[in-house]
Curated annotation (Swiss-Prot):
Pathway: Nitrogen metabolism; urea degradation; CO(2) and NH(3) from urea (urease route): step 1/1. Its EC number is 3.5.1.5. It is an enzyme of class 3 (hydrolase). The active site is at H323 (proton donor). Substrate binds at H222. The gene is ureC. The keyword Ribonucleoprotein does not apply. Carboxylation allows a single lysine to coordinate two nickel ions. Its main location: cytoplasm. Binds 2 nickel ions per subunit. GO terms for biological process: urea catabolic process. The lineage of its organism: Bacteria, Bacillati, Bacillota, Clostridia, Lachnospirales. NCBIfam families: PRK13207.1, urease_alph. Keywords: Cytoplasm, Hydrolase, Metal-binding, Nickel. This is Urease subunit alpha.
Length: 570
């Protein structure tokens, strides 16, 4: 005998299903459920009088060794580059083992995920699950950045530095073997995944090679240490040899050549361009043209995203501090002025919406906010919907194509760019369970829970002396994956393949999971999910107007944004 219930009641019990749309925070963006794998009538939920009990939704006889999961997230809405759908997520040994229908196969059909006595449950009803964010532009200036990143939904940091040294505050490099090894040891105590970038600003093949062999996953070229043609060529040559990425912040002053010279020096080899618009640094005024090339993986940093009425004014102060400039030196002021252009900043929003710019990152404490990568990504998506309308292929209520495009910018695409997409970057079977759970009304602003390798690392939590978990003050608090040996077992340090083969992690006594990066040097922009367009981009050298395939692209600055003061008092 079948039983029917209203859609409203079904959603209240089990979360939304096919035909329902979910609003993302207070934005104008909606996602529609494309498929539901949870099997109507056999849904599993936990609690008093609910389904997950022995002999009911829980298999009464199965052991962990026989296939019971370690953790199951029930009835979650998954928002991923690969789709927007509802499913249960089974996690075992810290990895996503299955996505589909969970329960007890002895009494239920089509069970993909077996719940047993070994299984913990997280109730995902009404929640959105995404992959943990990946920020590829980290200045490791202060370890306190990690708490801010985690509580924003970012679980992987890629960048360079050694602390609040002038080199680190400007250039995102961990230079030389000694510094690299000390930083690899230091991040052992941080409950987050880390990959380090070495200093690429040298023409010495030996100096570049020793850094890659020491454990960095890529090289960073920065104009403050020099972004000359020879530097670019040598870094890319050594990167090709060892299969690591090269990230570049090009020559703002055009002292050693123009953007065309940099493009010529790159010579078709894959490269990851930081803040490709240019306010964060790079050939003035036309570094943005590099977004057109198939070998360039272009990224933005978040201070310019989205373009608002305050963007231009804010940037001058940031730039003077971050690049060790002085307001009483005319040349320093001129340098700063050359980088801040409203025309290219406005165009950058549209380049993201068109899928031309592929990655969003922070530039943490160095002209960027580590805790706002995700927020500003969705603010940009919302602004573009309001100013440009729906993306092609989106119809009705849903904005699924736009949602997939923007979620890719801080999950799968940065993972691909740095050769870690086999391990993290999406909600897919076989990957480490770095997952973020969101209440829809807080999506993009404040996550509910952050899971690292299948264990809760951080979460909103009430007063620890209360009789239940929910009394005020509710704040983010580190959870058990942030303590003891569980910290090392729940986080990953990425190194170059050669460093892994040389056993650098063993020589240093690292306890974290250490994994090699690979598959980088044959990448093209076509590998960037939902963000692979390569049109012609031109910049007028007098007016700074940006054109895509001959068409002027610009937009008005936003005077008001979602995911802002409604969510953050301070």
């Amino acid at each position: 005998m079948s039983f029917s219930m209203t859609r409203e009641l079904y959603t209240a019990k089990y979360g939304p299903t096919v035909g329902d749309a979910v609003r993302l925070g207070d934005t104008d963006l909606f996602i529609e459920i494309e498929k539901d794998y949870t099997s109507y009538g056999d849904e599993v939920i936990f609690g008093g009088g609910k389904v997950i009990r022995d002999g009911m939704g829980q298999d009464p006889l199965i052991s962990r060794a026989e296939g019971a999961m370690d953790l199951v997230i029930t009835n979650a809405v998954i928002l991923d580059y690969s789709g927007i759908y509802k499913a249960d997520i089974g996690i075992k040994d810290g990895k996503i083992a299955a996505i589909g229908k969970s329960g007890n196969p002895r009494i239920m059909k089509n069970v993909d995920i077996i719940i047993g006595a070994s299984t913990e449950i997280i109730a995902g009803e009404g929640l959105i699950v995404t992959a943990g964010g990946i920020d590829t532009h980290i200045h490791f200036i202060s370890p306190q950045q990690v708490d801010v990143a985690l509580t924003s939904g970012v679980t992987t940091l890629i960048g360079g530095g050694t602390g609040p040294a002038e080199g680190t505050k400007a250039t995102t490099c961990t230079p030389g073997e000694w510094n690299i090894h000390r930083m690899l040891e230091s991040v052992e105590g941080l409950p987050i995944n880390v990959g380090l970038l070495g200093k690429g600003s040298t023409s010495s093949d030996v100096a570049l090679t020793e850094q890659i062999r020491a454990g960095v996953i890529g090289l960073k070229i920065h104009e403050d240490f020099g972004a000359m043609r020879s530097v670019i060529d040598h870094s890319l040559k050594i990167a090709d040899e060892y299969d690591v990425q090269v990230a570049i912040h090009t020559d703002t002053l055009n002292e050693f050549g123009f953007v065309e010279d940099t493009i010529d020096s790159i010579n078709g080899r894959v490269i990851h361009t930081f803040h490709t618009e240019g306010a964060g640094g790079g050939h003035a005024p036309d570094i943005i043209k590099m977004g057109a090339f198939s070998n360039v993986l272009p990224a933005s940093t978040n201070p310019t995203k989205p373009y608002t009425i305050n963007t231009i004014d804010e940037h001058m102060d940031m730039l003077m501090v971050c690049h060790h400039l002085r307001r009483n030196v005319p040349e320093d002021v001129a340098f700063a002025d050359s980088r801040i252009r409203k025309e290219t900043i406005a165009a950058e929003d549209i380049l993201h919406d068109m899928g031309i710019f592929s990655i969003m990152s922070s530039d943490s404490q160095a002209m960027g906010r580590i805790g706002e990568v995700i927020t500003r990504t969705w603010q940009t998506a919302d602004k573009m919907k309001k100013q440009r309308g729906k993306l092609q292929g989106d119809s009705g209520v849903g904005d699924n194509n736009r949602a997939k495009r923007y979620i890719s910018k801080y999950t799968i695409n940065p993972a691909i760019a740095h050769g870690i997409n086999t391990y993290v970057g999406s909600v897919e079977v076989g990957k480490y369970a770095d997952l973020v759970l969101w209440q829809p009304q807080f999506f993009g602003a404040k996550p509910n829970m952050i899971i690292k390798c299948g264990m809760v690392a951080n979460s909103i939590m009430g007063d620890a002396n209360a009789s239940i978990p929910t009394p005020q003050p509710i704040t983010y608090r580190p959870m058990y994956a942030s303590y003891g040996l569980a910290l090392q077992r729940s986080s990953i340090t990425f190194v170059s393949k050669i460093a892994f083969e040389l056993g650098v992690h063993k020589k240093l006594g690292l306890e974290k999971t250490v994994l090699p990066v690979f598959g980088i040097r044959n990448l093209t922009k076509q590998d960037m999910k939902h963000n692979c367009e390569t049109p012609e981009i031109t910049v007028d050298p007098q007016t700074y107007d940006v054109r895509v395939n001959g068409e002027l692209i610009t937009c008005e600055p936003a005077a008001e944004l979602p995911l802002a003061q409604r969510y953050f008092l301070f």
